Curated annotation (Swiss-Prot):
Gene that specifies this protein: agap1
The record's note on its domains: The PH domain mediates AP-3 binding.
Keyword DNA-binding: no
Zn-finger segments (C4-type): 627-650
Name of protein: Arf-GAP with GTPase, ANK repeat and PH domain-containing protein 1
Organism: Xenopus laevis (African clawed frog)
Organism lineage: Eukaryota, Metazoa, Chordata, Craniata, Vertebrata
């Protein structure tokens, strides 16, 4: 690292410390100002908000997030007309917001890449990229609007600004063109070729066109940029060579052949313990050691200032502010029992238990307040007060754990899980969770069965059942075959951890911990293992699995939670009844967590299978085997509002038309919600062309081999100019009234034809002044999600109310159709409903008169 970079890092550290230290003095000033308020209620309300802000600041990710949780830092740049704020809002919430945020924003979201969860940090920059932004990001998304030339040119400017601060070859980039603002009055001005050229100029980055109004490619953009970051980190990690990973402790002083500065090591608490999370910060040539860099940073800047020392913390993490709420200080914990867990899920079981410390040199037992929630999480706090304040707590996710009781056999497997071996063989049977133990090699391999190992009457052995843990091995052996006369079966609770918290495999007293893979166990396996624990006997089991002597039963109220990652937690109750109640409750939560996990997998698998079958049924519709515009075989792109399939070349032309004419989506690459599948399944190419090519006589339709220009002329004439559109079925009746009738009769082809001919005003025509229902109300009353979706795409007003003030959502609730209700809520339809009752006779007469103009009584409302 050169001297200038070292100075820059030192300045950045000083600035961060100054920023961090400035927060609390300002908060304390707010507390002082609160004392001047005369209204106690307002004073307490503001104080609670300030305390919440202070707690959120103190518990930010840099102090609380596990170092095993990696981060992905994504920056998004573009001008105010680019649509970047709508893109981010759609990704985070699934909804569309048209307003652009001039100041940008900071957001967090979990994202999964290659099966691993990452904390995605999204930085929506309000202006051009600066030096601090450039050095922070792992990847950059450049956003412009396809209808705004200035936003397009701004990308070039922002890219050059970024290149001034950082080498762009080390930053993954994605270019996004947004379609949100494209409309009939605001056409597209950036064609596909110019956008592709821009992506090539930006070091050939990936280019996407998105639409935040209905989510086109939004998820793909962020998923792709996350995958690019992970791939870049892996490449950089491999290129570093022998420096595989950083030490787990930030205070570790050893360095690899390529040294890493202390600045970056101090940041590893946010990004996990792997060098791949921040390998871009490793300098190419070693220049300054960690100790030298630490010396350069003045010690005064890394310690609290005198102002901070004089000011004591006033939040609920520590003591309450004097005078802020004297009643709370006078109340004891017993008087506040009703407030336990306020604002959180009510535990299904809670109480005081003893917990053994996990520290290697200090394994005493301490009282903990333990709670078990119905979400499969067990939490323990040092005291009831800490639990009530929700501080200093630790959680155990029970999904990948098991619970053991020392001195008690694990549950015996039945024949359906593992057949019992003969008493003479003492063999280990098959089907043990896919783990295969080799008696010769000492390796643990993945298989579907465990080989039998017979050891005769003298005992059975697991051979060298070893696993690597840091730099040592641990092997287990089993003896005393007379205790296993009915066959040994390894269950989930049979594998002890190597932290000294589990007594044995299968809780047998004859399992020893050795440092060499001997088959013969030492004569006294427990001679040196439990010096730190109170004396407990673990021999001579009874049939029910409990000890047979009164001495063994004395004070034996312990249970152990063991995880798949070899972590263990020792707890002890005050009685057998309390211990068994805890064990039963924990086992039930483990079972519930496993069942919910399996249910989620089955649901996901079933959803995926159902979607694949639905898409295949779409391909099998009449005419869908060929492109709707050029007859190319096997089209795999779709236009949602047209309900037709097309080839990839025609889909590019459709994208240029704008979303107001054609909403393009990939059958294979995009998600398909149920309402979209129903629209595509209801229409198809044959029905679509019967409408859009109903008057194409005398015109030659292009074929799959036709040049792109010819296809584009045909498509624009067909959809943009509507030259081949079938004529209206009735010239005497207004188009809006025809649409109302067709919707009431659920005539899909007529609705498509009328929507293609109609304007926004005609689509929103009502049944009459005494009714004021639109076609959307009628479609919702029928529960027809296909018609509802088509009407919304063609501009029907989802906020429209009938004569009695009811929105379309009220009619959807009457029809008991959840799909229609969810669709309306997605597009912002108000969830308001007036009392629905039978229509008075006078209103019925008026409605008959109004509906007679529509051509029939099918439009007469029966509810208000």
């Amino acid at each position: 690292m050169n001297y200038q970079q070292q100075l820059a890092n030192s300045a950045a550290i000083r600035a961060e410390i100054q920023r961090f230290e400035s927060v609390h003095p300002n908060i304390y000033s707010i507390y002082e100002l609160l004392e001047r308020l005369d209204e106690p209620v307002l004073q307490n309300q503001i104080r609670e908000h300030v305390i919440a802000i202070e707690d959120a600041f103190v518990n930010s990710q840099e102090w609380t997030l596990s170092r095993s949780v990696p981060e992905l830092k994504v920056g998004i740049v573009g001008n105010l007309a680019s649509g970047k704020s709508a893109l981010v809002h759609r990704y985070l919430t699934g909804t569309y917001v048209q307003e652009e945020s001039p100041e940008g924003g900071r957001f967090k979201k979990e994202i999964v890449v290659d099966g691993q969860s990452y904390l995605l940090l999204i930085r929506d920059e309000g202006g051009p990229p600066e030096a601090q932004f450039a050095m922070w990001v792992d990847a950059v998304i450049f956003v412009f609007s396809l209808e705004d030339e200035i936003s397009f040119q701004t990308v070039y400017h922002y890219y050059s600004r970024l290149a001034n601060y950082r080498n762009t070859s080390e930053i993954p980039m994605v270019l996004v063109g947004t379609q949100d603002a494209i409309s009939g009055s605001n056409p597209r001005v950036i064609d596909d070729s110019r956008a592709r050229k821009l992506s090539n100029d930006l070091k050939r980055c990936t280019y996407y066109e998105t639409c935040a109004t209905y989510g086109l490619n939004v998820e793909r953009v962020f998923q792709d940029v996350a995958q690019k970051i992970v791939a870049t980190r892996k490449k950089q990690q491999l290129s570093i060579g022998p420096c595989k990973s950083l030490p787990n402790s930030p205070s570790h002083t050893s360095v690899c052949s390529t040294q890493v500065s202390a600045v970056h090591i101090s940041q590893t608490s946010n990004g996990g313990g792997s060098l791949s999370d921040y390998s871009s910060s490793v300098p190419s040539t070693p220049s300054t050691s960690q100790k030298e860099l630490r010396i350069d940073v003045p010690p005064a800047a890394s310690t609290p200032t005198p102002v901070r020392k004089q000011s004591k913390r006033r939040s609920n993490l520590f003591t309450s502010r004097k005078g802020s709420d004297p009643d709370k200080d006078k109340k004891g914990l017993e008087s506040r029992a009703d407030s336990i867990g306020s604002g959180r899920a009510i535990p299904i079981k809670q109480g005081m238990l003893l917990k053994r410390s996990g520290k290697s040199l200090n394994k005493e037992w301490k009282k903990k307040y333990v709670t078990l929630s119905d979400n499969g999480v067990l939490t323990y706090h040092p005291s009831l007060h800490d639990y009530m304040q929700n501080v200093h707590g630790k959680e155990i996710d029970l999904l990948r754990t098991t619970v053991k009781v020392p001195g008690k056999r694990p549950p015996r497997a039945t024949s359906s899980c593992a057949p019992v071996a003969s008493p003479k063989t003492n063999g280990l049977t098959k089907e043990v969770s896919g783990l295969q133990i080799s008696p010769n090699t000492g390796n643990v391999t993945s298989s579907t069965s465990v080989t039998q190992m017979a050891s005769g009457p003298s005992g059975i052995s697991l051979g060298s059942f070893s696993r690597m843990d840091g730099m040592h091995q641990r092997s287990y052996s089993v003896s005393s075959a007379d205790q296993w006369s009915e066959g040994a079966v390894i269950t989930n609770s049979a594998i002890s951890s190597d932290t000294g918290l589990g007594d044995s495999v299968c809780s047998s007293p004859s399992i020893s911990s050795t440092t060499s893979p001997k088959l013969d166990p030492p004569p006294s396996p427990h001679a040196n293992r439990k010096k730190h624990r109170r004396k407990k006997s673990t021999s001579n089991f009874k049939v029910d699995g409990l000890s047979s002597t009164a001495e063994e039963q004395e004070e034996n109220f312990e249970f152990i939670i063991v995880s798949l990652t070899s972590q263990s937690w020792h707890f002890e109750a005050t009685s057998y009844e309390e211990r068994d109640a805890w064990v039963q409750a924990i086992e039930s939560q483990i079972l519930a967590s496993l069942q919910s996990c399996e249910s989620s997998k089955n649901k996901s698998r079933l959803t995926s299978q159902n979607e694949a079958l639905a898409l295949q049924s779409i391909r099998n519709l009449p005419g869908n085997s060929h492109c709707v515009d050029c007859d190319a075989q096997s089209p795999d792109w779709a236009s949602l509002n047209l309900g037709a399939l097309m080839c990839i070349e025609c889909s590019g032309i459709h994208r240029n038309l704008g979303t107001h004419l054609s909403r393009v989506r990939s059958l294979d690459l995009d998600d398909w919600p149920p309402e979209l599948i129903k629209v595509m399944s209801a229409i198809g190419n044959e029905l679509a062309n019967s409408v859009w090519e109903g008057s194409s006589q005398g015109h030659v339709k292009p074929c799959s081999e036709s040049p792109r220009e010819e296809k584009e002329r045909w498509i624009r004439a067909k959809y943009e100019q509507r030259l081949f559109l079938s004529p209206l079925p009735c010239r005497d009746l207004p188009l809006g009234q025809q649409l109302l009738r067709a919707t009431a009769e659920e005539d899909l082809r007529a609705v498509i034809l009328l929507l293609a001919h109609g304007s926004r005003e005609e689509v929103n025509e009502t049944c009459g002044e005494g009714d004021r229902r639109t076609s959307l109300h009628l479609a919702c009353r029928k529960g027809n999600v296909v018609l509802v979706q088509l009407l919304i795409w063609y501009g029907v007003d989802v906020m429209a109310r009938d004569f009695h003030g009811n929105t379309a959502l009220a009619y959807a609730k009457q029809a008991v159709t959840s799909e229609v209700r969810e669709l309306l809520l997605q597009y912002g339809c108000p969830d308001e409903q007036f009392v629905l009752m039978a229509t008075p006779n006078l209103s019925r007469k008026n409605n008959r008169n109004n509906n007679s103009n529509a051509g029939g009584s099918g439009l007469m409302p029966t509810l208000i």
